[in-house]
């Protein structure tokens, strides 16, 4: 027993050193410490996550000074011990740092809580709110923000940094199946956000399809990512704003935050998928705020060189996952035609958590933008029949004469539907599980 004592002491010291190093949040990013064993089985339905499954997930909570209560409003992603990534629209109405509290390492949250959090949760103040200089609250352009945290967050078993794309990765590859998480509402007009962190799988959707006339009719820009399902099924919702859209290469690779939950029309409606701010387009901006070294620490290894195989244009996950989730895309071959939009299938499904910051009203129809993934800026031309061109002209005139009006997600004058959740007096209605199909 005495002979084993030096070995035991050495192990204790080693564990102590590892734990100390881990508290700086400079370790590996995008790693799930505790995974739900069913996560690989259920492909379309949302489910409750396991504690510690998404250690970079942050709850942004509005703080009311008169009674010290906190109300979940948005989600965010921990980048390191000092910075959180989120959506700019979360601060349209609450721009002061003292209006906010940040909760890390949470699995369950209490809406309207006025007591200190319990371990392993950590509550922090916001030292600085950095909103993109060109953020447009009307068009939803540049919907990205950073929060400086004080005091620094301590990383551990339930708190860890998320990854951002590598500069050389390029835009997210389509098709690809990814994850969304949040404490958002489980359906439109739900009484309050979900008390438990939920997770769900969603498909990345081609921007041509997402911007077609029966979908978002050109509202989506080149710095957005669409994710969800054509028929609805599952989606983020109020209370999920600012939270991450995450993809990974394989079960052994880290998750990479490819999008920030921004806006959508309703929740889980057919042909109205969630719209996310693409993080890859803002890596330079993020580096200018948190520092290039800090950004490098949360970027995975440089991706493998792309294959010579032509990209597949599809809207359903392939039977075999691609070798990596990012790749440089070659120009679209002229013989490929973009897929036609699917027939309308009304469907109602729940949504994801986050206070409401609606900004999505189509006051004046905009021409659909060209496909926006990196090298896909030039769309090929196809010859249309006279009848087809006439039909397009009639549709365009109808849109100008009768612009589409969508119900707002926010109780203010703006018509866009943010995924931000406004807090209201607590309801006696029991909460329901989030994100089920």
Swiss-Prot record:
Annotated glycan sites: 22, 211
According to UniProt, the name of this protein is Acrosin
Give the originating organism: Rattus norvegicus (Rat)
One GO MF term attached to the UniProt entry: peptidase activity
- Give all residue intervals belonging to the Peptidase S1 domain: 43-291
Among Pfam families, the record links this protein to: Trypsin (PF00089)
Share what the entry says about its subunit structure, partners included.
Answer: Heavy chain (catalytic) and a light chain linked by two disulfide bonds. Forms a heterodimer with SERPINA5.
Catalytic-site annotation from UniProt: 89, 143, 241
Which PROSITE patterns does this UniProt record tie to the protein? TRYPSIN_DOM, TRYPSIN_HIS, TRYPSIN_SER
- What is the protein's known function? Acrosin is the major protease of mammalian spermatozoa. It is a serine protease of trypsin-like cleavage specificity, it is synthesized in a zymogen form, proacrosin and stored in the acrosome.
How does its record describe regulation of its activity?
A: Inhibited by SERPINA5.
Phylogenetic placement of the source organism: Eukaryota, Metazoa, Chordata, Craniata, Vertebrata
Q: Name one GO cellular component term.
A: acrosomal matrix
Q: Which cysteines are joined by disulfide bonds?
A: 25-155, 29-163, 74-90, 178-247, 210-226, 237-267
Can the keyword Glycoprotein be found in this entry's annotation? Answer: yes
Q: Which gene encodes it?
A: Acr
What biological-process GO terms show up in the record? acrosome matrix dispersal; acrosome reaction; activation of adenylate cyclase activity; binding of sperm to zona pellucida; penetration of zona pellucida; protein catabolic process; proteolysis; response to steroid hormone
Q: Which residues form the signal peptide?
A: 1-19
């Amino acid at each position: 027993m005495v002979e084993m004592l030096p070995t035991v002491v050495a192990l204790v010291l080693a564990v102590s050193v590892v734990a100390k190093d881990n508290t700086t949040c400079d370790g590996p990013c995008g790693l799930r410490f505790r995974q739900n064993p069913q996560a690989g089985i259920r492909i379309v339905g949302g489910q409750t996550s396991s504690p510690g499954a998404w250690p970079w997930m942050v709850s942004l909570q509005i703080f009311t000074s008169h009674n010290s209560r906190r109300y979940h409003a948005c989600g965010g992603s921990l980048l390191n011990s000092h910075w959180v990534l989120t959506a700019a629209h979360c601060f349209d109405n609450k721009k002061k740092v003292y209006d906010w509290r940040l909760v890390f390492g949470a699995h369950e949250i209490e809406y309207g809580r006025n007591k200190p959090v319990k371990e392993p949760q950590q509550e922090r103040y916001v030292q600085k709110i950095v909103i993109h200089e060109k953020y447009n609250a009307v068009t939803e352009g540049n919907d990205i923000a950073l929060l400086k945290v004080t005091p620094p967050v301590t990383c551990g078993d339930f708190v860890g940094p998320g990854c951002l794309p590598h500069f050389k990765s390029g835009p997210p590859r389509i098709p690809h199946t990814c994850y969304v998480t949040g404490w958002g509402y489980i359906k439109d007009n739900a009484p309050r956000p979900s008390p438990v962190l939920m997770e769900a799988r969603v498909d990345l959707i081609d921007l041509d399809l997402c911007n077609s006339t029966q979908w978002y009719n050109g509202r989506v820009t080149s710095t957005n990512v669409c994710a969800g399902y054509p028929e609805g099924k599952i989606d983020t919702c109020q209370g999920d704003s600012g939270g991450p859209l995450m993809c990974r290469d394989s079960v052994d690779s880290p998750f990479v935050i490819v999008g920030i939950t921004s806006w959508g029309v309703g929740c889980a409606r057919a042909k109205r998928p969630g719209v996310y701010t693409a993080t890859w387009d803002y890596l330079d901006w993020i580096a200018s705020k948190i520092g290039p070294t800090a950004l490098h620490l949360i970027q995975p290894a440089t991706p493998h060189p792309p294959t010579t195989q032509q990209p597949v244009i599809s809207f359903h996950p392939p039977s075999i996952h691609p070798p990596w989730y990012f790749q440089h895309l070659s120009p679209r071959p002229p013989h490929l035609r973009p897929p036609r939009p699917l027939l309308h299938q009304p469907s109602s499904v729940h949504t994801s958590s986050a206070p409401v910051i609606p900004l999505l009203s189509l006051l004046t129809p905009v021409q659909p933008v060209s496909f926006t993934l990196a090298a896909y800026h030039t769309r090929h031309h196809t010859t249309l029949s006279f009848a087809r061109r006439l039909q397009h002209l009639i549709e365009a005139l109808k849109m100008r004469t009768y612009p589409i009006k969508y119900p707002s997600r926010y109780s203010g004058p703006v018509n866009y539907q943010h995924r931000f959740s406004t807090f209201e007096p607590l309801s006696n209605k029991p909460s329901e599980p989030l994100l089920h199909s």
